[in-house]
Design a protein with these regions (language model features):
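Beta-lactam-recognizing serine transpeptidase/beta-lactamase-like catalytic domain environment
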Residues: 55, 115, 158-200, 206-437
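Periplasmic/cell-envelope proteins involved in peptidoglycan metabolism and beta-lactam response
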Residues: 1-180, 187, 196, 201, ...
Length: 461
């Protein structure tokens, strides 16, 4: 009986410990529900804190009347709209709602609240400094192809800070009636974190990593690309016949048939394992933001399904942020780190609020494989499909283009992708550019990546 009692006590303690852990690390997700009555209640007696970008530009604040206000510049408001959100909580993934735990004072200590009560001071929430750059975000918004949807993500792969998280189209938080009336346009959706797209040839980074990790003698690998590769009852095709190629040649030319053939040697178990190590099918429970889960089919795939998956088509789906993280993995020598959106939190008294941990990191590929991938991605930009992403002045860009077929009830198009990073220690920027139905990744996404990376360098972020 005593043993049973001890077991019950231990089980209760474990459940309580897990509950406390969940509240501390993921409590923001519970609080962030716009229908949470605690949020509306807290807004009645707490002055909501200020949101700024990394340079101190005010993105949102509360005026003397208690009304939530946003930056006076319309271009700025729109450029950061999905990151900041709105006062009504319609964009529940925006910082105004998701970080209400800070902004509305939920993390204030009992001593801070007692001090406010004794002095008769209205409680004020914490001020939150985000890692994004308003200047970079606005520049990306201006350069993005007009009337196109998509997203651009820029990360500092050394610090894990998100420098830009731009989604198109955008909305104005001061005019939510228009945003809601035009909801079909999807401006309230953050495509950088919530948009799930076939990654196309950018997924060849994952397939290449899997081959390097699992297949022997790849230095002697050669494949004769005739322009099509029959597999099952289908054929995987290329725009032209590349002839006999090494694996390095095939990656630089983004040869679909070579990677389709490579998938048959790998099999779905090895390729699926690498994809999952890289974050596919994983639950992204990040501290600072909500990111939808990318997917890779891991059931017993047919030969043709496996071939399509190896080139990022079929049932493979990823968010632009995830693909930027994959670029960061290569840049970081095979380690994936948790992205950071909150740079600092300051209390009403001027003190520093302890941040939630951003220490989550995991080795997902070996350092040797990452080094080989970097050299292959550099070749893509120097002489392959990503030449339009190249920078001058000694900056070396490593990258991969993609043109992912996508269809709806009305038409079939191609999403333009570029995924890569600057391989210089003094400019540690990783990037993902996605232009929905933009066509060629090399022609559309790569030039925007080049402009964006150059702007980040010029700003000294």
């Amino acid at each position: 009986m005593r043993l049973l009692t001890l077991l019950l006590i231990l089980m209760f303690a474990l459940v309580a410990a897990y509950f406390c852990y969940s509240v501390y690390f993921y409590g923001g997700r519970w609080i962030a529900n716009p229908y949470n009555p605690r949020i509306s209640s807290q807004k009645q007696h707490v002055v909501m804190g200020t949101l700024t970008d990394r340079d101190g530009t005010v993105l949102a604040y509360t005026d003397e009347s208690g009304t939530r206000r946003y930056n006076s510049n319309a271009a700025t408001r729109k450029a950061v709209s999905q990151v900041v959100g709105d006062s009504s909580g319609k964009v529940s993934t925006g910082a105004d709602t998701f970080h209400a735990q800070y902004l509305l004072g939920f993390r204030s200590s009992i001593f801070e609240r007692l001090a406010d009560a004794f002095t008769g001071t209205t409680q004020r929430g914490d001020d939150v400094e985000l890692t994004i750059s308003e200047r970079l975000s606005r520049y990306i918004s201006e350069q993005f192809p007009r009337d196109k949807r998509g997203a651009v993500v820029v990360l500092n792969y050394k610090t894990n800070e998100i420098l830009a998280l731009v989604s198109m189209p955008q909305f104005d938080p001061t005019d939510m009636d228009s945003a809601l009336a035009d909801e079909a346009a999807g401006a309230l959706v953050n495509r950088a974190t919530q948009g799930l797209y076939p990654p196309g040839s950018t997924f060849k980074i994952v397939t290449m990593a899997s081959a390097l990790e699992n297949l022997p003698d790849l230095n002697d690998f050669a494949f004769d690309c005739t322009g099509y590769y029959p597999v099952g009852s289908y054929s995987v095709t290329d725009g032209s016949a590349h002839g006999v190629q090494s694996l390095s040649d095939a990656f630089a030319h983004s040869c679909n048939t070579t990677f389709a053939a490579l998938s048959q040697d790998l099999g779905y178990e090895m390729l699926g394992k690498t994809a999952e190590e890289m974050g596919f099918n994983k639950n992204f429970m990040f501290s600072d933001l909500i990111v939808y889960n990318s997917s890779y089919p891991i059931d017993d795939l047919s030969a043709e399904d496996l071939a399509w998956s190896a080139i990022g088509q079929g049932r493979v789906l990823a968010t632009p942020l995830h693909m930027a993280l994959i670029a960061s993995v290569v840049a970081n020598g095979g380690v994936m780190n948790e992205p950071q959106l909150v740079k600092s939190v300051t209390t009403a008294q001027g003190g520093n609020r302890a941040l939630l941990s951003h220490a989550s990191s995991k080795r997902v590929i070996s350092a040797d494989v990452a080094a080989r991938l970097e050299s292959e991605m550099i070749r893509v930009v120097k002489s392959g499909t990503g030449r339009r992403a190249a920078l001058d002045n000694g900056y070396v860009v490593a990258g991969k283009t993609g043109s992912a077929e996508a269809s709806n009830d009305k038409s079939v198009g191609a999403h333009a992708w570029f995924v890569g990073y600057v391989a210089n220690d003094n400019a540690p920027y990783a990037i993902c550019v996605l232009v929905e139905n933009g066509g060629s990744g090399g022609a559309v996404a790569a030039p925007l990546a080049r402009k964006t990376l150059q702007k980040a360098i010029n700003l000294g972020l």
